Amino acid sequence: MAPKGSQRVVKKIVAENRKARFNYEIIDTYEAGIVLMGTEVKSLREGKANIAESYASDEDGEIWLINSYLPEYLQANRFNHEPRRRRKLLLSGREIGRLRSGINREGMTLIPLKIYFNDNGRAKLELALAKGKKLHDKRQSEKERDWNRQKGRILKDNR
């Protein structure tokens, strides 16, 4: 048996918003719980979620995930869920206050980065407070990424 301190925390990533880091400058990240129905959890466990076009919004002091896609669970009966329904996010009051003040700043938005199951089997959402990049910023980050790849190749060849 392994000692207590050496146990790894394994996250099963269900959906990831890969374009978010390219289209947005990430300012801060938060971990939020998601209020889900039973069939939504089963659908998530199948790994068929999509959060590429979704965003989070503040309404009446609560944070909601909007336009995320969790397909219907095929083995469910008539009590299935609506695939694109709004889902409430579970955050502490202090975190909601920080997010609300961040959203009120010009150009800031809340975007989901990934949905995963933590080590307790709970569905969590990694939420980011982000600022949209302009076209020239995207080009600059693409140039930096290409240059870093070239540097890596050059260093690898010189070994």
Swiss-Prot record:
Keyword DNA repair attributed: no
Record localization: Cytoplasm
Location of the region described as Disordered in the Swiss-Prot/TrEMBL record: 136-159
GO molecular function per UniProt: RNA binding
GO annotation, biological process: trans-translation
Pfam family, one: SmpB
Keywords: Cytoplasm, RNA-binding
Record flagged with keyword RNA-binding: yes
GO CC terms, sorted: cytosol
Family, per entry: Belongs to the SmpB family.
Protein name in the entry: SsrA-binding protein
Native source organism of the sequence: Rhizobium rhizogenes (strain K84 / ATCC BAA-868) (Agrobacterium radiobacter)
